[in-house]
Amino acid sequence: MKYFAEMINSLNFDRVFVVDPHSSVVAATIKNCNVINTNIFVSNVLDMLIHDGITPIMFFPDEGAMKRYSKGIKIPYAFGVKKREWGTGRILGLDVMGIKPEDIKGRDILIRDDICSKGGTFYYAAKKLKEMGARNIYLFVSHCEKSIYDGQFGDDKMNLLTVDYEKKSIFGTTQHRKLIDHVFTTDSIYPFKSDENVTVFAMNVDYAENVCDCGCGCHCKEDK
């Protein structure tokens, strides 16, 4: 990051827009940096869901995401605690905290985080939430890599967008449902157009220009 920041700084830009960086170090090392959050897109997703009669619970995959994104939200939320393999750091599972298990049952969930690569974090989060009785699960990430199609999960080694969740009914039959019902993201790095599995919101110049000079990602200029 240090050398990347030095390269950008050497170009002497008047303003540098950075969308929802994974680390706060970015804003500290890049000169004239304006951090843009993606709250407006999350609000759009919530509006879409509420319009369809869905009032979801917000879920953050870890405590860090909760601290970054929970401020000001007006719906119930919970967060995850990842269980990792000692030595490799590989994710083995996830526990849900901050909400009673019975409050998950039958509810729709919107998972929010900054980036999705192959989707292991979201696979284990969604799997745990489904086991707790969650109904539909949606995912919003600010940045989505093409490798979301490469992750191999479940017995059939399917990717995050196609992997099934199997549930035995009271009659003994097996019900198959998608683990993640839909993904929402921006076109910050996502190379494709929206499809049946993914909705892509466009980042544009007007959006960036309306960010205030304080660098916090708010849009107070729109009110002036």
Segments (PLM) and residue ranges:
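PRPP-associated nucleotide enzymes
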Residues: 1-224
